[in-house]
Amino acid sequence: MANTWWELQISCESALEDSVSWRLEDFGCRGTASESKGDSCLVKGYLPIFQAQLLDLAALGLWLQQDALCIGLSSPTLTWQLIDEEDWASSWKQYWHPQEIGDRFLINPAWLPSPENSDRLIIRLDPGVAFGTGNHATTQLCLESLEMRLSEVPKSFISKGGNQEPVIIADIGCGSGILSIGAVLLGAQKVYAVDTDPLAVQSTFSNRALNEVNPERLVPAEGSVDILKKLIERPVDGIVCNILADVIIQLVPEISEISKPSTWAIFSGILVEQSTSVAEALEKHGWVVATMWKRKEWCCLNVRRT
């Protein structure tokens, strides 16, 4: 049974899609997929059989009902079944299609041909079991924020000869590597990508090769900020971090140690109601929130050093 997975299926109102996806990820699902049909939505999540028993699944059903009740929507319906690993690895792919994000990106599933004559930056992606397909609001907000940051080069990044200084970025909680690859395509000279999940790091390596990114420009590693401190030669110019709010708050002191006065950062994975707590933690360690972008119940904080 080691290669057997739970497939969880949640039928819900479309307005609950992000909330259900977040709940599944928090529950430990290694991958999620969703399909919208009018005002309704089917969200699927996958996790190894050893990670949950039937009582755990019943508790998940109650949490989903409570989440819906809190925002005045009808309760979702949760069903589950056991599937083999081979079926799990391919079952969600039928729901994922090419997606434009922001003004410049196109996320293209690796198993589909790349569109011809596109003027967008194409990220070919096979997330495997890692978070980050471009479907989630937080990933979209981070990519759009990277567009803004890397198209507006600060004067401090311009050398005396008028040339742009190389931009070094840290991606904390890299997942599939989608944000790291996006940063490289936008012109970042080098991205250090870390994740505590070894499967996410493996996915980033695979997607780096899939997009033919020079290994010198994208360096994945297992770990967190402690590993970044060993990898980087100097403080980074930019930081992108799309993980849960509680984890961001815990990491803020360490993140500040790898920054310099001109460093900017992008934080997401934050529910709107959690934004104040995250902003307060950042301000205590010398950061100021420049803008907060919202999408559905999620937000993204664009910050800089004070």
Swiss-Prot record:
One Pfam family recorded for the sequence: PrmA
Q: Which UniProt keywords apply?
A: Cytoplasm, Methyltransferase, S-adenosyl-L-methionine, Transferase
GO molecular function terms listed in the Swiss-Prot or TrEMBL record: protein-lysine N-methyltransferase activity
Record: residues binding S-adenosyl-L-methionine? T139, G173, D195, N242
Q: Name one GO cellular component term.
A: cytoplasm
> Which SUPFAM superfamilies does the record match to this protein?
S-adenosyl-L-methionine-dependent methyltransferases (SSF53335)
- Is tRNA processing one of the keywords UniProt gives this record? no
Any one GO biological process: methylation
Which InterPro entries did the record assign?
Answer: Ribosomal_L11_MeTrfase_PrmA, Ribosomal_PrmA_MeTrfase, SAM-dependent_MTases_sf
Question: What EC number(s) would the UniProt record show?
Answer: 2.1.1.-
> What is the annotated localization of this protein?
Cytoplasm
Catalytic activity field: L-lysyl-[protein] + 3 S-adenosyl-L-methionine = N(6),N(6),N(6)-trimethyl-L-lysyl-[protein] + 3 S-adenosyl-L-homocysteine + 3 H(+)
Family of the protein in this entry:
Belongs to the methyltransferase superfamily. PrmA family.
Instruction: Tell me which NCBIfam families the record gives.
Output: prmA (TIGR00406)
PANTHER family, per database record = ELECTRON TRANSFER FLAVOPROTEIN BETA SUBUNIT LYSINE METHYLTRANSFERASE
Name-wise, this protein is: Ribosomal protein L11 methyltransferase
- The species this protein belongs to is Nostoc sp. (strain PCC 7120 / SAG 25.82 / UTEX 2576)
